[in-house]
From Swiss-Prot:
This is UPF0758 protein VC_0510. Signal peptide: none annotated. Zn(2+) binds at H107, H109, D120. Keywords: Hydrolase, Metal-binding, Metalloprotease, Protease, Zinc. One of its GO terms (molecular function) is metal ion binding. InterPro entries: MPN, RadC_JAB, UPF0758, UPF0758_CS. A motif (JAMM motif) lies at residues 107-120. Residues 36-157 form the MPN domain. Gene3D superfamilies: Cytidine Deaminase, domain 2 (3.40.140.10). It comes from Vibrio cholerae serotype O1 (strain ATCC 39315 / El Tor Inaba N16961). Disulfide bonds: none annotated. PROSITE patterns: MPN, UPF0758. Belongs to the UPF0758 family. GO terms for biological process: proteolysis.
Length: 157
């Protein structure tokens, strides 16, 4: 491998990551506490900018009030390049700490393929059932990679 090409690729990747970080900041400023998450495409793009640059899987929560206004975006678990352990107890704890009425789950696939795995579908169902016990609505689970996949849009919720 040509060392100059390798250095160029590293530099280009670094610049791309900087751009993504700035884009995430801009989107984060658009979705501040109190903003209603009513546009699915904008919500997917927000999640993609927040989680898209990670090299490991990260599972996060968009914690919402009764009017689906953002209370907090919380990164809860970090895993490996192809998996992240998600613990329902910790999810319930995070939701109740801010008195959220609804939640959107989000996680990234560093591979770029946003197709949800069977494990993704199972944990989503388990979390949905668990949160129903404390009257918290699960509105969506967004998986981000090169594109975003919405469980709600696929009719899986």
């Amino acid at each position: 491998m040509n060392p100059k090409t390798s250095e160029y690729q590293k530099q280009q990747r670094y610049q791309e990551n900087e751009i993504l970080e700035h884009a995430a900041e801009i989107l984060a400023n658009r979705y501040v506490r109190g903003d209603a998450l009513t546009n699915p495409d904008a919500t997917k793009e927000y999640v993609r900018c927040k989680l898209g640059s990670y090299e490991r899987e990260v599972f996060a929560l968009l914690l919402l009030d009764n009017q689906n206004r953002l209370i907090e975006f919380k990164e809860l678990f970090q895993g490996t390049v192809d998996a992240a352990s998600v613990y329902p107890r910790e999810v319930v704890k995070a939701v109740l700490e801010v008195n959220a009425a609804a939640v959107i789950f989000a996680h990234n696939h560093p591979s770029g393929d946003s197709t949800p795995s069977q494990a993704d579908r199972r944990i989503t169902e388990r979390l949905k059932d668990t949160l129903a016990l404390v009257d918290v609505r699960v509105l969506d689970h967004i998986v981000t990679g090169d594109t975003c996949t919405s469980f709600a849009e696929r009719g899986w919720l």
